[in-house]
Amino acid sequence: MQAGQTTPSDAAEVGGPERDLARLIDSYLTTQLLYVAARLGVADALADGPRTGREIATSVGADPDVLTRVLRGLVLDDVLAEEDDGRFALTALGERLRDGVPGSLRGAALARGELYWSAAAGLLQAVTEGGTAFEHVHGEPFFARLAADPEREAAFQASMADRAQREAADVVAAYGFPGIGDLVDVGGGSGVLLDAILRATPELRGVLVDRPEAVERARARLGAAGLDGRSECVEGDFFATVPPGADAYLLSRVIHDWDDADARRILTTCRAAMPAGARLLLVEAIVPERAHDGPEAVRMDLHMLILLGARERTEAQFRDLLAGAGFDLRRVVPTGSAAGLSVLEATVTSAAR
């Protein structure tokens, strides 16, 4: 290092803007510390109370000295607490790294620390040359990579299910799904949102359409909830066809996975299946005009850019996208969710019938 140069750690000692920027630069540590903790099951090892680093290491199969250093890093981010006797304990943040607890983010930590992490290295190339960051790094599309790697596919799906679980109640409470007898959940994943809708609206029947592996998980979830009599899970390709004749077609966090051309193809497929008077319901984050007015939507937009070359959209962009597929945007219902989701309700334009 040349004279006069400083490392981020040196800058952190200075204070002020240098310190704050140094913390941002060092944030790469946080992602990987959380990933290691999630991967090893550190939070679950602390579920019964505080333990020493050595005790945790024995429980999760790790090197005691190295793991203890990782645990201290997590203390700095308030994920763990370090007690006077040197034992470590879960904080409210750390509790959300446990597997299967309400509000769990373990799946997100696993996904961010693996595929998202590696794909981000391709962002500069995507910005300067075009294309998708993920494909620059891995040489194939994101979903193709997942399909070839069952372990990472499981981690990603766990992340999606955790997220859907956190958001479903807000969506149902905000929109209510009134006047709908039959609903098709297009790309409904593991069925978390359809489960919540069916529980809240006893008069409604639902059909979930997705890939075979998702359908299997959804069928198991809805069956365990006793909702199999009011639901059906079918394999399908939403670029080709969806079940016709329903009162409403729901696409939750689907359209943001695709660029405008592919998104329009999906919407056109739905339009072809919709009878007169049917509703199209999109559950999506709406990008605000100014970043600080919707930080979660802005962050998700960057995830979509890096992984898929796709995007979150402003309300005006949604309106244009829907119009291009033969829909009128009728209303936007904010859900109040932490992710800033809204339900966009649209109907087929008279000219498109």
What do these predicted ranges mean?
Residues 2-82, 177-178, 182-353:
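Alpha-helical subdomain
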